[in-house]
C-alpha cells in the first residue's frame, strides 16, 4: 500500500509540474492523513514561495487578538492577523503563479510582546514553546490541513526553524560577571517558558545553572567574535546552550514532531552561523539520546531528501572568496555532514551590487565562479532577490531592475525563492497581502490578472518547461569590468544550450565577436525578453554574434528553437594590431581597413552609447586618435564597427591593458576627535558599539588620468556587524562640484544642511557598510528630501591596519570630464543610509543621536572643501 501511494504521488507531481493545472482533491478530516507524508522531490526542480504568515492572509479573524495588547492591524510592529488558514485558502492563487513549494516563517508558539518594548513576536522568531502552533496562527489541525492541501496539489511545505535562541525572557541589568552569572541577572516580569527543559532559565537558581540549558550571558556586539556569536545573546534573545546533549535531544524531539505530525518536507534554519558546527552534525545526522537526528527521522518517514537549508548570512567582499568559503562550511564534510543547502547570501550580495548598486557585472561573474568552486551541488542552493530582513529590491530600485534580477535567478542552477508579494510589486518589507494590514490600507493583493503577476508567472513557466535552466551547467561568456553593462551567460544541458544576454546599463551595449558554437548559423527569435525591441539573434556562418543590446534589457535564446533564414555579410572591417599590448600613455592612434561598410565608429568596453565616430577615412583605410584619460587602468576591449549595405553589423576587436601612472595631488589633515557635530555638542547613540567611527583624520587625493581616488583615514574602523563593504557605524558622504556643470544642488539631501560656501554639488556618493549609493544632482529632482538620479556606484577598499577607506571614482561616474581641475570635494559623516539617516534629538537613545533636534544638521564630522588644482 505504501509503495502504491508513493508511486501515485510521484505521478501526481509530474503532472502538476508539467502543466500546473491540477487542483487536487478536496481535503477533509477523513482523507487528510493520506496526504500528510509524501516523498521528497528533486529540489533543483522546485520553486519556493516564502511567506511571512502574519502578513499573507487572514483566514480566521477570531484568533487575531489574544488580549495581550499585541494585535494592531495596520501597524507593522504588531500582529496583523495572517494565519495558516489564510495560506490554505490562497493555495490556488499560489499554485496559479506556478511555484511548487511554500516556505513559512516559524509557526511555533511565540512570545507575543517583547518585555523591553521593542516589538512583538509576529514574525515567529521569538519562541516560547516548540511543540505548539502559536494561537495567532491557528492550531495543529490548521497546520495539518495546510500540509495535506499542498501535498494533494503536488506542492511541498518548508518550515522555518530557530535552534539558536528563545524569546526575551531575561536580561542583565548591570555589568556582567562571567564568574558569577547570577549577578545582575533579571527575569522579565512576563509569562515564562513552561516547556521542559526550556523552563530552566533562571541564572539565580543553582539547578538551572547546573542544567545549563541556556548560555547565561549578555548581548554580543561583535559578530566577528566566534565565542560571543555562539554563546552570547543576540538582540537580547535568550541563547540556548546547543552544546548541551540535553538541549540537542530536546530540539531533535520538538522539531522532529513537525515532521511526524505535519509532514513538513524541509527546514530552513534561522541564524545557523550563531550555532557551533558540531551541533548541526549531531542535530541532523545522529541519534544521541532518545531521539533520531532530523535527517534520519525524515528518511524513516519516507523523505529521502529532506531539505535542510541554513540562513548562513555571510556577505562576501567583492572579488573575495572568503565569504563563500565560510558559507560552504555549513554543509560539513563527507565524513561529518551538516546541512544540505544554504540560502545563497553570497550570490544575493552580488545581485545587489550588480543590479541595484550598478557595479561592474564582473562582480557577479566572480561570485558565480566562487560558488561553483566551493559548492559541489550549486543547484541545491536557495537563490533569492528579496527576504523579510531587508528592504525589497523594488523599494531600492525600479521595475526593470527587478525583472532582470528575477530572470537571472530563474535561469541559473539552484532553487529560486520568490518572496511573497513580489508578484504584486509590494514595496513594504513585511507588508500585508490583505486589506487593512500594514502597508495595504485600501486593498488586497491577490490579483492574478495584474501585469506583474503574469510576468512572474511567465518566468516560472519558462524555468519549468526548459530543463536546461534547472539542470544545466552555467558558464559566463561576457561581462564588464568597469561598470554596469553586459552580462552574458550560457546554460548547457547535453545538446541543449540557452544563451542569456542581460544589459544592466541604462545605455546601449555592444555584443561583438561572441562565439556561440552550440548555435547553428541563422536567425533565432527570443524565447523570452525584457525591454527589447529587436528580439532576433543573428548567428553568422562562423557562429559569431554581433548585436546591440538595448538599455536595461534581457533576452533568452535556446539553440533548439528553429533558426530562420541564414544571412551573409557584405563588407569587412579590420583593426590593425600596431599598438602595444600594454599602454602607458593617455592617447593612441588607431588604424585599420574597411570595405563595403558605412557609419563606422569605435566602441570601448561595449559602451555603444558613447560610440566614437570614425571620420578620418582614406579609400579603404581609416584612422582615429583615441584619448585614454577617462579609462581605468586594466584590460580593455576596443571594437571597430560598421554596417554593410543590408544594415548588418560588422565588427573587429582587440584587447589592450592600460597602465597609466598615478599622481598624488593633495593631503588634508582634520582635527582628531572633533566628531561632535557642527556645534560641538552632539553625542553618539548610546549603544555600546558606537565609539569614534565617524571621526575623519585625513584625506588624500590622487588622479590616474581623470579617475579620482580618495583615501580617507578614520580614527577607527570597525566591522562589528560583519558588513559586506568592510566597515560599519558610519555613512561617508562625498559631494563633488564639477566646474563644467552649470546647474548644481545647494541642499544636502536628508542632512538638514547645505553645500559649504554657498556652493552646489553635482554628484553624491553615500558609502555605507551595508550599501553604497550614488546620485547625480539636478535642481528639479534633488533637494532637502530628494536624492537625485541614481547612477553607478564605486568600489570601496578598507585597510584596517592604517584605518583607511579608499574609494576610486572613475571618470565615467563623473560624466567623462575633459579635466578635473577646479573640482571641489566635500566630505562629511553620519550613519544610516542616504535616504534614512539616523535621527537626532535633545537626548540620545540606543540608536539616535543626542545634542540637537529633528532640524539639526545630520553631520557628525566634516572636512573643509578641497579644490583640485
Region roles according to the model:
Residues 19-50, 65-68, 73, 80, ...:
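Carbohydrate-interacting/catalytic domains
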Residues 497-504, 706-716, 805-811:
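Short, well-ordered beta-strand segments enriched in hydrophobic/aromatic residues
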Residues 40-46, 54-257, 261-262, 282-283, ...:
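Substrate-binding/active-site clefts of carbohydrate-active enzymes
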Residues 653-671, 735-760, 802, 813-869:
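Acidic/polar low-complexity flexible segments
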Amino acid at each position: 500500500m505504501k509503495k502504491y501511494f508513493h508511486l501515485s504521488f510521484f505521478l501526481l507531481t509530474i503532472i502538476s509540474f508539467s502543466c500546473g493545472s491540477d487542483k487536487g482533491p478536496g481535503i477533509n478530516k477523513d482523507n487528510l492523513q493520506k496526504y500528510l507524508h509524501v516523498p521528497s522531490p528533486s529540489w533543483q526542480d522546485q520553486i519556493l514561495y516564502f511567506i511571512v504568515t502574519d502578513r499573507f492572509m487572514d483566514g480566521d479573524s477570531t484568533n487575531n487578538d489574544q488580549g495581550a495588547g499585541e494585535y494592531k492591524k495596520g501597524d507593522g510592529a504588531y500582529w496583523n492577523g495572517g494565519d495558516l488558514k489564510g495560506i490554505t485558502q490562497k493555495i490556488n492563487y499560489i499554485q496559479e503563479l506556478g511555484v511548487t513549494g511554500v516556505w513559512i516563517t516559524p509557526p511555533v508558539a511565540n512570545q507575543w510582546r517583547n518585555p523591553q518594548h521593542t516589538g512583538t513576536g509576529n514574525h515567529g522568531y521569538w519562541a516560547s514553546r516548540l511543540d505548539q502552533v502559536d494561537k495567532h496562527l491557528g492550531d495543529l489541525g490548521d497546520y495539518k490541513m495546510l500540509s495535506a492541501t499542498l501535498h494533494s496539489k503536488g506542492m511541498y511545505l518548508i518550515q522555518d526553524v530557530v535552534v539558536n535562541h528563545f524569546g526575551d525572557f531575561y536580561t542583565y541589568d548591570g555589568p556582567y560577571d562571567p564568574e558569577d552569572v547570577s549577578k545582575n541577572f533579571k527575569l522579565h516580569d512576563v509569562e515564562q517558558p513552561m516547556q521542559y527543559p526550556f523552563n530552566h532559565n533562571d541564572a539565580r537558581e543553582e539547578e538551572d545553572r547546573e542544567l545549563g540549558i541556556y548560555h547565561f550571558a549578555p548581548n554580543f556586539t561583535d559578530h566577528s567574535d566566534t565565542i560571543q556569536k555562539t554563546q552570547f545573546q543576540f538582540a537580547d534573545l535568550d541563547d540556548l546552550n546547543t552544546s548541551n546533549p540535553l538541549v540537542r535531544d530536546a530540539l531533535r524531539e520538538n522539531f522532529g514532531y513537525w515532521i511526524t505530525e505535519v509532514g513538513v518536507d524541509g527546514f530552513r534554519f534561522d541564524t545557523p552561523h550563531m550555532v557551533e558546527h558540531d551541533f548541526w552534525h549531531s542535530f541532523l545526522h545522529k541519534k544521541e539520546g532518545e531521539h533520531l537526528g532530523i535527517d534520519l527521522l525524515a528518511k524513516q518517514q519516507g523523505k529521502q531528501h529532506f531539505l535542510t537549508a541554513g540562513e548562513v548570512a555571510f556577505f562576501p567582499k567583492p572579488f573575495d572568496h572568503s565569504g563563500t568559503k565560510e558559507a560552504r562550511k555549513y554543509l560539513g564534510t563527507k565524513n561529518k555532514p551538516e546541512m544540505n543547502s544554504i540560502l545563497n547570501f553570497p550570490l544575493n550580495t552580488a545581485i545587489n551590487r550588480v543590479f541595484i548598486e550598478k557595479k561592474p557585472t564582473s562582480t557577479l561573474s566572480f561570485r558565480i565562479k566562487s560558488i561553483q568552486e566551493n559548492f559541489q551541488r550549486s543547484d541545491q542552493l536557495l537563490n533569492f532577490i528579496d527576504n523579510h530582513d531587508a528592504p525589497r529590491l523594488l523599494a531600492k530600485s525600479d521595475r526593470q531592475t527587478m525583472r532582470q534580477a528575477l530572470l537571472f535567478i530563474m535561469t541559473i542552477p539552484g532553487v529560486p525563492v520568490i518572496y511573497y508579494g513580489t508578484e504584486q510589486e509590494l514595496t513594504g518589507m513585511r507588508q500585508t497581502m490583505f486589506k487593512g494590514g500594514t502597508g495595504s490600507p485600501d486593498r488586497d493583493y491577490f490579483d492574478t490578472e495584474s501585469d506583474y503577476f503574469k510576468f512572474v508567472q511567465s518566468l516560472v513557466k519558462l524555468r519549468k518547461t526548459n530543463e536546461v535552466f534547472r539542470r544545466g551547467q552555467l558558464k559566463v561568456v561576457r561581462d564588464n569590468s568597469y561598470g554596469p553593462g553586459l552580462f552574458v551567460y550560457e546554460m548547457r544541458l547535453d545538446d541543449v544550450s540557452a544563451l542569456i544576454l542581460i544589459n544592466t546599463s541604462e545605455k546601449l551595449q555592444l555584443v561583438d565577436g561572441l562565439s556561440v558554437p552550440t548555435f547553428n548559423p541563422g536567425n533565432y527569435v527570443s524565447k523570452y525578453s525584457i525591454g527589447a525591441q529587436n528580439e532576433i539573434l543573428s548567428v553568422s556562418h562562423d557562429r559569431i554574434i554581433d548585436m546591440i543590446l538595448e538599455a536595461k534589457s534581457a533576452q533568452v535564446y535556446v539553440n533548439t528553437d528553429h533558426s530562420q533564414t541564414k544571412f551573409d555579410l557584405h563588407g569587412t572591417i579590420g583593426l590593425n594590431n600596431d599598438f602595444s599590448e600594454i599602454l602607458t600613455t593617455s592617447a593612441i592612434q588607431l588604424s585599420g581597413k574597411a570595405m563595403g561598410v558605412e557609419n563606422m565608429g569605435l566602441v570601448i568596453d561595449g559602451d555603444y552609447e558613447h560610440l566614437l565616430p570614425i571620420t578620418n577615412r582614406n579609400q579603404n583605410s581609416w584612422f582615429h586618435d583615441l584619448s585614454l584619460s577617462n579609462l581605468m587602468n586594466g584590460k580593455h576591449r576596443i571594437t571597430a564597427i560598421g554596417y554593410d549595405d543590408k544594415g548588418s553589423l560588422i565588427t573587429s576587436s582587440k584587447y589592450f591593458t592600460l597602465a597609466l601612472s598615478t599622481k598624488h595631488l593633495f593631503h588634508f589633515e582634520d582635527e582628531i576627535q572633533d566628531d561632535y557635530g557642527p556645534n560641538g555638542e552632539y553625542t553618539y547613540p548610546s549603544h555600546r558599539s558606537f565609539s569614534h567611527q565617524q571621526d575623519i583624520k585625513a584625506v588624500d587625493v590622487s588622479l590616474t588620468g581623470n579617475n579620482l581616488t580618495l583615501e580617507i583615514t578614520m580614527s577607527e574602523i570597525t566591522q562589528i556587524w560583519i558588513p559586506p563593504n568592510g566597515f560599519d557605524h558610519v555613512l561617508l558622504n562625498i559631494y563633488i562640484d564639477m566646474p563644467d556643470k552649470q546647474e548644481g544642488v545647494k541642499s544636502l539631501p536628508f542632512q538638514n544642511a547645505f553645500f559649504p560656501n554657498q556652493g552646489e554639488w553635482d554628484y553624491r556618493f553615500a558609502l555605507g557598510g551595508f550599501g553604497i549609493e550614488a546620485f547625480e544632482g539636478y535642481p528639479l529632482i534633488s533637494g532637502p528630501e530628494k536624492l537625485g538620479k541614481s547612477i553607478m556606484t564605486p568600489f570601496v577598499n578598507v585597510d584596517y591596519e592604517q584605518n583607511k577607506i579608499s574609494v576610486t571614482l572613475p571618470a565615467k561616474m563623473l560624466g567623462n570630464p575633459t579635466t578635473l581641475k577646479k573640482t571641489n570635494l566635500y566630505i562629511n559623516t553620519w550613519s544610516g543610509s542616504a535616504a534614512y539617516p539616523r535621527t537626532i534629538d535633545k537626548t540620545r537613545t540606543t540608536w539616535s543621536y543626542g545634542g540637537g533636534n529633528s532640524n539639526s544638521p545630520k553631520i557628525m564630522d566634516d572636512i573643509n572643501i578641497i579644490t583640485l588644482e
